C-alpha cells in the first residue's frame, strides 16, 4: 500500500534536485517552429528516462523525433503519459528580463522558455515517479510518449501512433499539463476542446497600387477579406456558418452542476486579462462558466502584405 506521507517527505526533501533537472532541460533550446535543437533535446529527454530505469528510444518521424519510454510495475495495468519537449519561439527577446534559455530563479519561481509548457510537466511527473520508486516498485506499468511537434500542430504524431499501436496500449492516459487555479488549488481536467484551424487568403492584384492613384477603381484585398469575415459571426455572438452547431452535444444537468460547484472566475478573468467586462452582458456565475467552455469561433491573426513587380 502506498504511503503518501513518505511521498510528500521525499518530494519536499528532493525539490531542489528536481528544479536543477528542469533547469538543465530548459537550458537546451528546442524551438519547433525554427527546427532549433530538436534532436539534442530529444536525446536529453531519453537520457532522463533511462536514468530512472525506463527502456527509452528515440523514433524518427518526418519532423522532430518522438521519445518513447516504458518501465514495468507491479500490476498488469498501464498508465500512459503524453508530453512534448518543443517550445514556442522566445521572441521578442527584449521582453525577457533574463535570456530565455538561461533559467533564473526569482521570488520562488523559475523563469525560462519551456518551464511551464511543457518541460516542467515532464520533470514533475518524473519527480513523482522518483517518489514512488523510493518506496519500491511502481504500482503499475508506466509509459511516456514525448513528442517534439506539439507547438506546430503535431504534424507527424499520427504516423508515430499508426506505427506503434501495440506499444501505446494502456488503461489510461494523462495528457500534457496540469496546474492550479487562482486559489492555488490543483485542478484536474476531464477534457479539452479540439481546434479546427482555417486560413483564408485573398489576392486581388498582381502588384502594389498607390491608393491615391488607383485605389478608387481597383478591388482591395483587405476589404474583401473583412467583408468575408464579417459574415462568420453576428453581433449577437452567434456563429453563422451553416451547420456549425449541428453535432455539438449540449451540456447535461450534471455538467452544469459540476461547473456550478467551481469557484467564480469573473474577477480573476478581469484581473488576468485586463478586461472591463464580458460579452453578452455576462457578469459571472454559472452562465459565465458555461460560456467560457462553449464552442467558439475566433480570428487569431491578420497578415497583410503588398508586393511590387520587379523592374
Label the predicted regions.
Residues 86, 179-181, 205-207, 302-307:
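Short, glycine-/Ser/Thr-/acidic-enriched flexible segments
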Residues 110-112, 206-212:
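Short small-residue beta-strand/loop micro-motif enriched in glycine and branched aliphatics
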Residues 116-191:
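Acidic/histidine-rich catalytic neighborhood of metal-dependent amide-processing enzymes
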Residues 2-115, 132-138:
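Acidic/His- and Gly-rich active-site-bordering loop/insert found
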Residues 187-203:
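Flexible glycine/proline-rich, aromatic-decorated loop/lid segments
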Residues 181, 190, 197, 211-302:
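Acidic-enriched catalytic cores of C-N bond-cleaving enzymes acting on peptides and small amides
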Residues 16, 27, 31, 50, ...:
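Generic secondary-structure signature for well-ordered alpha-helical cores
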